[in-house]
Amino acid sequence: PNAGWSDYYANESFFLNYPDDARKEWNYMTEWETKNGHVTYKESADKLPAISKYYDYDNGAPGKSAQANGITCIYRYADVLLMYAEASTRATNSVNAQALDAIQKVQKRAGYAQDQLTTTTDPTAFTTAVFNERGWEFFAEMKRWFELVRLEKVSEVRAETWNGSLFQ
């Protein structure tokens, strides 16, 4: 990152709580080269991990970059699966096999080991797991704010933000 106008940085506590799966490696840059040599995010001016999941519009090819000339918000199959998992659980106040299958499909695609998959059938614990999974899966896709408002969690999460930003 060059600390220019198009760089995007992540909340460190969110980064530290992010599962060590394939998404984390793709979504974040934690070290990079500068004109002064190799640095880690903790050595950088902002001391924050860089968000690196955007398309490289200048070069016309996908790549890892903390810069984005335009943020592409999309709805993905993972979004549909997690919406289903949450909605069916809230509608019936129970976790059915299809809801478990939906969240586990997202987790398996992300590279979770079998023992890391969500297996709870407690509705409260399950909806919390879905909320967390949505945060990790849709990191920096501009969905988090709406999740926080919808679930009335803004004040709960705001205390953990850097510089008052709820970018995730």
Task: Name these PLM-found stretches.
Residues 1-14:
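Polar, glycine-rich mid-to-C-terminal structural blocks
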Residues 20-168:
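Acidic/polar-rich alpha-helix caps and helix-coil junctions
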